[in-house]
A protein has these predicted regions:
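Alpha-helical adaptor scaffolds
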Residues: 37, 56-104
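Amphipathic alpha-helical segments of tetratricopeptide repeats
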Residues: 2-16, 50-61, 95-106, 136-146
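Residue register of alpha-helical TPR repeats
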Residues: 20, 27, 65-68, 72, ...
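"A position-specific structural signal for the A-helix of alpha-solenoid helical repeats
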Residues: 24, 31, 69, 76, ...
Length: 165
């Protein structure tokens, strides 16, 4: 909070939409949401990511800077909703994140959006869709050499669907 208050002295999380942000300030707001999530307050994190998405949709519809941030914020929002066991919402947001990655050509969180969508689909009883999303996430991680994430996907796919990669 102190970092963003250096450039926006009256910044309040409850009023995210009341300010104009630089790309770096949007990254700070995103990191504040991540800090709440890591501390276990996923409800607060989800609210921060939701407000940041609303801000981005209102102020930065087609700007290049928002296009880089959009997939990341959608992923973080989906992750928070997943941790809150709000699977339908989380799957929808993760799909939006996947589409944003593809639309804007920013693939850093594509595999993560697919993994969240796969997990949510599993908990929603959509096992075939879940298996397909895990496969997609697995092969993206394999191609990109994301070894840590590859192992997470292997473990989840085996645990939930008895799929061995």
């Amino acid at each position: 909070m102190q970092a963003i208050q250096m450039t926006i002295p009256n910044f309040r999380l409850s009023k995210i939409e009341d300010y104009l942000y630089t790309l770096d300030e949007m990254k700070l707001v995103n990191q504040i949401g991540n800090a709440y999530s890591l501390a276990g307050d996923n409800e607060k994190a989800a609210d921060i990511f939701y407000r940041l998405l609303q801000y981005m949709r209102c102020h930065l519809q087609e700007m290049v800077t928002s296009n880089r941030m959009l997939p990341l914020v959608l992923y973080n929002f989906a992750r928070s909703l997943d941790l809150l066991e709000r699977y339908e919402e989380s799957a929808r947001v993760a799909r939006n994140g996947k589409e944003a990655c593809i639309k804007y050509g920013h693939y850093q969180v594509l595999h993560s959006c697919l993994e969240i969508e796969a997990e949510c689909d599993f908990f929603l009883g959509k096992k075939e869709e879940s298996a397909e999303r895990y496969r997609e996430a697995f092969y993206i991680c394999k191609v990109m050499r994301y070894e840590d994430d590859l192992q997470i996907i292997r473990n989840e796919a085996q645990k939930y669907l008895d799929i061995i990669f």
